Curated annotation (Swiss-Prot):
Keyword check for Ion transport: no
Keyword annotations: Cobalamin biosynthesis, Methyltransferase, S-adenosyl-L-methionine, Transferase
GO terms assigned for molecular function: cobalt-precorrin-5B C1-methyltransferase activity
InterPro entries found in the cross-reference section: CbiD, CbiD_sf
Biochemical pathway: Cofactor biosynthesis; adenosylcobalamin biosynthesis; cob(II)yrinate a,c-diamide from sirohydrochlorin (anaerobic route): step 6/10
Gene it is expressed from: cbiD
Transport listed as a keyword: no
Organism of derivation: Salmonella arizonae (strain ATCC BAA-731 / CDC346-86 / RSK2980)
Protein name listed in UniProt: Cobalt-precorrin-5B C(1)-methyltransferase
Upper classification of the organism: Bacteria, Pseudomonadati, Pseudomonadota, Gammaproteobacteria, Enterobacterales
Length: 379
């Protein structure tokens, strides 16, 4: 995505909606400028970063301060016209140089702490997700060079109060906000315009001659397809939470094979007949897992443990410990059955496949051998 595409508004019902940037971009920019100020020993009031999506952001710096080998800077979060709980708050970084050669990243005041398994971060760590961790560390390394070390602390004085308006506590992230953002950019869209934009991508793929499509919830699915399946991501289309809508659109456009690829946290819902996977529509992840574990003869102890989990990742640890990993093949087959039930009045329904993978990019299960599916997709 270019600077021009970032500046270009998103149009909805004739209204131009402004894009914004994530807490991850704010933290990255704040850390970069703080590191630069320590090195140069003068205040800087504007900083540029390149987001993971390739957008260059030029951001204003607030509250810059230098004291010896330490500097502090803040970036104000701007969600564009997609206003959320963190919009308008300051995200600070404190950078202290040292001779260790290592960069250490921590979360301070207002940054949540991970207290439960299942969010992809170690227990007790700061709620700074993987992509922002990488961009923060890379930006600081670029600023200080290969030999120096630095302690980087991200903090947000308003974080604890703002977090009350988020789902963090339900996920076991306590005491503040999360530093998040896979692309670094916030794109505001209503649901209908968002769905239409996704459908347009399907239309473009079909117009190029593709007969097989891979539908993924988000960026992680595309990475899995590329790295673990060895399939050209030209066939990948993001479906977000709109599973049913995108399947129907794929059928309308004449695709002959639909492959659903994603983490169980999203795809499990399809096994229960839930075709809009946003949590405000329906959840039932644990109930679905418990029901299908019971069908496979799982002991009551495992069913109880899974039923009490707050996240799919946490439930997966219990499932693995009890030796019920074969449930993922079972669920993948059930997902395909649900899709075919939805399409039961379609004259010539497409082939449907489903593949489930873990956060660390390993195959968990599929309705048939993944190699077989991948070979067909490469034709």
């Amino acid at each position: 995505m270019s600077e021009l595409s970032f500046d270009a508004p998103v149009w909805h019902h004739g209204k131009a909606l402004r894009k914004g940037y994530t807490t991850g971009s704010c933290a990255t920019a704040a850390a970069k400028v703080a590191a630069l100020m320590v090195l140069r020993q003068h205040l800087i009031h504007q900083v540029s970063i390149v987001t993971p999506s390739g957008v260059t952001l030029c951001l204003n710096v607030e509250s810059p301060h230098i004291e010896g080998q330490q500097a502090i800077a803040a970036i104000r979060k701007d969600g564009g016209d997609d206003v959320d709980a963190t919009h308008g708050m300051l995200i600070f970084a404190r950078v202290t140089l040292n001779d260790s050669g290592e960069i250490t990243l921590t979360g301070g005041e207002g940054i949540g702490t991970v207290t439960r398994k299942g969010v992809g971060l170690p227990l007790g760590s700061a709620a700074i997700n993987r992509t922002p961790r990488h961009t923060i560390e890379s930006a600081v390394r670029e600023a200080i060079g290969p030999a120096r070390g630095a302690d980087v602390e991200i903090f947000a004085p308003e974080g604890e109060a703002r977090a009350q308006k988020t789902y963090n506590s339900r996920l076991g992230i306590l005491g503040g906000i999360s530093i998040i953002g896979t692309t670094g950019i916030v794109t505001p869209m209503s649901e209908e315009s968002w769905k239409r934009s996704l459908s347009l991508e399907l239309e473009i793929k079909r117009a190029s001659g593709l007969m097989r499509v891979i539908l993924v919830p988000g960026n992680h699915g595309e990475r899995f397809v590329r790295e673990q399946m060895g399939v050209d991501t030209q066939a990948v289309v993001t479906m977000s939470n709109f599973v049913g809508y995108m399947i129907e659109e794929a059928v309308r456009l004449g695709f002959r094979q639909i492959v659903l690829v994603g983490h169980p946290g999203k795809l499990i819902k399809i096994a229960a007949g839930i075709f809009h996977t946003h949590s405000h529509i329906a959840d039932a992840r644990m109930e679905t897992l418990v029901a299908h574990l019971a069908l496979l003869g799982a002991p009551l102890e495992l069913l109880t443990l899974v039923g009490d989990c707050d996240t799919t990742e946490a439930a997966m640890e219990h499932i693995e410990a009890y030796g019920f990993g074969h449930i993922y093949n079972h669920l993948a087959k059930r997902i395909c059955w649900r899709v075919m039930q939805m399409l039961r009045f379609t004259k010539t329904p497409p082939v449907c496949d489903a593949i489930l993978f873990s956060f660390d990019n390993h195959i968990l299960g599929s309705n048939r051998p993944v190699d077989e599916i991948a070979k067909e997709l490469q034709c």
